[in-house]
């Protein structure tokens, strides 16, 4: 659910992915999950074509997408290899989304939360200073929705994420907005680990009210 919610928040879920994108996402998830280890070789085009039931050209396009995101490298004569994590485009929307489809490593979650704690207080301040009346109304509407959805874990997660998105967008800072994926990923990862009981939802609402 978290991966698809991430795409929803990024307004990308309405675009149906083509075959090459579907292949890149499936391979990307497996790489992020560690099924393919760093420096390990990935099966050749023929084997991947048979496994996924698509043409070799589709496999090539899917691999190219992963090369562009830093997850794979292709060398003539030695095959396709998984690159070291330090080379991955970790701020890429797909890479962030794929982390939400697997068990998040504690160190990566901590790094996401560190970034969130650094960015969100500033975002709230800028939203107060630079946000329009309509944007402030969006924040208030999202907070009200949180109260209305507090009985449901999944619906509350959506409402909470929309609240934070409204604040980020009200800050009217293009650089900050380009990094909203980090906030979404940190938020969804932490909620998945800590918000397992609907009764816990109500306890977080007063903290969100303070932003208003």
Identify the residue ranges that each predicted region occupies.
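Short linear motifs at protein or domain termini
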Residues: 1-119, 125
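Membrane-interface catalytic loops of GT-C/OST-like multi-pass glycosylation enzymes that act
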Residues: 197
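Conserved amphipathic alpha-helical segments that form helical-bundle/coiled-coil interaction surfaces
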Residues: 112-193, 202-210
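Short helix-capping and inter-helix turn/linker motifs at the boundaries of alpha-helical repeat units
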Residues: 18, 201-202
